[in-house]
Each structure stands twice: as structure tokens, then as C-alpha cells.
């Protein structure tokens, strides 16, 4: 092969590789950065008098990569993995609030499937490729004097939706 033909072949391969890199699929990642295995403390008499106990804070980061220069709107949602907390305690007794106080405490709902639901939306941000945003969720358990089970529990799920 002549040197000129070899250079032309390498140049074509270089353009093909550059084009493939430019057409990469957008990747959005939701990373739980804290509180993923936290539990509530045992309630005290003062907690029962107050009617609730504050629980752990879950923190997260949403990041984007690849997929061109178009900004992406990302929405983070929180939900419970079970319909009850066990021992007869309703899931509605578990409350959540974004750490930025953009919403009041509200009851957690079951399941993160389907369309984005305002009842489980922690936050929404439009971010450019290669950018990220962080947030958090505070948990609170409503108490009453009739609560006598030694423990309650559910799996907390978080999901990220991306558009366009």
C-alpha cells in the first residue's frame, strides 16, 4: 500500500470514530449519596407527645453524560416499596419533604411506576450534558400512643425520569 493511501485510510477511520463518539446515547445517573441504609431511632416519650419522630435524610446526585448538547429535564421521585409499614401501620404515616423545603411534609405513596406524579416528585432540574444537581429528602414517621409494634419498615425507592 502506498503511504498516501494508508494516510487516507487512517483519516477515514478517524472520522468514523469521531462521528460514533458524537452520537453516543445520553446517560443519566441517579446516585444515592447518603442515608440509603438509615433507620429511625426508637421513639421517646417526647416523640409520642409531639406526634412524630424525624428520621434519616436521604441525599442524591443526578448527573448526565453524552447525548449531544441539548439540555435534559430530570425529575427525581420517591416512593415506598410496600403498601403498609407492617404491624397494621398505614404507609401514609411515613412522610417525606425535600431538604430545600420547597414542599411541606407529605405522605409517601406506593410505587414509582408510570408517568411522573407530583405526589412523589422531590425535584426537577434542567441540566446540560456533563452537569449534575444534588438534593435530599427528609423522612418523618407519624406516631400515636397505640403504636405498640417493636418495628415497622418499608423499602424506599427513588427514580429519575428524563425528558426529552
Please state what every model-predicted region is.
Residues 21-101, 118-164:
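N-terminal small/polar-rich segments of proteins
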Residues 1-10:
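Bacterial N-terminal signal peptides that target proteins for export
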Residues 77, 109-110:
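Secreted/extracellular small peptides and ectodomain modules produced from precursors
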Residues 17-18:
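N-terminal signal peptide c-region/cleavage motif recognized by signal peptidases
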Residues 114-116:
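Extended, solvent-exposed segments with strong compositional bias
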Residues 10-11, 21:
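Leucine-biased recognition of intrinsically disordered, low-complexity hydrophobic segments
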Amino acid at each position: 500500500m502506498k503511504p498516501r493511501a494508508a494516510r487516507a485510510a487512517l483519516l477515514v477511520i478517524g472520522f468514523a470514530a469521531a462521528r460514533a463518539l458524537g452520537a453516543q446515547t445520553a446517560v443519566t445517573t441517579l446516585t444515592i449519596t447518603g442515608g440509603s441504609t438509615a433507620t429511625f431511632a426508637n421513639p421517646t416519650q417526647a416523640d409520642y407527645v409531639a406526634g412524630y419522630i424525624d428520621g434519616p435524610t436521604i441525599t442524591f446526585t443526578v448527573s448526565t453524560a453524552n447525548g449531544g448538547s441539548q439540555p435534559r429535564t430530570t425529575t427525581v421521585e420517591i416512593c415506598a416499596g410496600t403498601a403498609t409499614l407492617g404491624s397494621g401501620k398505614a404507609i401514609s404515616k411515613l412522610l417525606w419533604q425535600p431538604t430545600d423545603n420547597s414542599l411541606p411534609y407529605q405522605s409517601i405513596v406506593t410505587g414509582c411506576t408510570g408517568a411522573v406524579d407530583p405526589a412523589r416528585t422531590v425535584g426537577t432540574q434542567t441540566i446540560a450534558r456533563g452537569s449534575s444537581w444534588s438534593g435530599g429528602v427528609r423522612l418523618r414517621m407519624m406516631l400515636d400512643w397505640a403504636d405498640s409494634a417493636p418495628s415497622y419498615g418499608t423499602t424506599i425507592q427513588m427514580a429519575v425520569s428524563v425528558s426529552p
